[in-house]
Amino acid sequence: MKLRIFILFLFLSLLHAQADIIDSLKTQPRDSIGLASDSLVLRFLEESGIPISDNNKVKLLKSGREKFIDLFEAIREAKHHIHLEYFNFRNDSIANALFDLLAQKVKEGVEVRAMFDAFGNWSNNKPLKKKHLKKIREQGIEIVKFDPFTFPYINHAAHRDHRKIAVIDGKIAYTGGMNIADYYINGLPKIGTWRDMHMRIEGDAVNDLQEIFLTIWNKETKQNVGGAAYFPLHESKTDSTDIIVAIVDRTPKKNSRMLSHAYAMSIYSAQKNVHIVNPYFVPTSSIKKALYRTIDRGVDVTIMVSSASDIPFTPDAALYKLHKLMKRGATVYMYNGGFHHSKIMMVDDLFCTVGTANLNSR
């Protein structure tokens, strides 16, 4: 049996969710449907038009140290291009080392493109300033800001790029919960150790992540980057160690429901257990209803959130929601070893979601 991993991004979907499938799960016992939870979710994603591939190698990177060692090594081996898309590049030791390495790759003839979110940079306590961007560009690195703030600023509040994507030569990709910052290794004084999850992917799912990057890049820069050089063929033969990966993407100003429907569908499909780790647990109405109904069916629902947070009052808001779920029958754990920023969910020990998506209205 192949492991299923569904990667969930915090942007609006380009596609419409299949609400009828979710409705059937709300009213029918799982046994009467006759499908395991992973098969139900795969069917939902396929009918929603979500890209799914089954010839992937996936390596989970369970710490900042693991992520940056692996990413830097892949960048050193790059031959054609390096694409980076992050919510922010914090101007610290890790970012400085990264841009030094990227500058060296430019000298070797490798194309380097990097993109960061304007709000993510502004809200960062060590932002990239004009002088930093000037130096980076002088080294031959193309770096652009996603959706710079213009008047009226309120129009840009929810139109943000929360992705964390790296694509190397179209053959290796990285995604997950980590931006570029040294606190993923060193922690922060007020909250302690910063724990997060990232992953390295090889296989056809790399093409899906490349397509996401190039779509946003070309829109922001008015360029037309693309072609076969950016989408090398991957080995089509699969074996039992390969992993099925589905990329659930959200694109601002399109459809606000795909991500919440994908989460809700995953929860409704559960037959035995749902395990959730999420740092900002303020679920939408649809996800909250899915959790209530799944608990009422006797499914074991376990949720872990951090007692510390980088955003004030977030733990208080989460506890209010979690108290209601505990009264319903959920098991709740508080993580006290620092800040657990991972965004993961496991269902029936059959599939998991990993990504940048928080369980809140954004």
PLM region descriptions:
Residues R4-S13:
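Sec-dependent N-terminal signal peptides
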Residues L15-R362:
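Charged, low-complexity intrinsically disordered terminal segments
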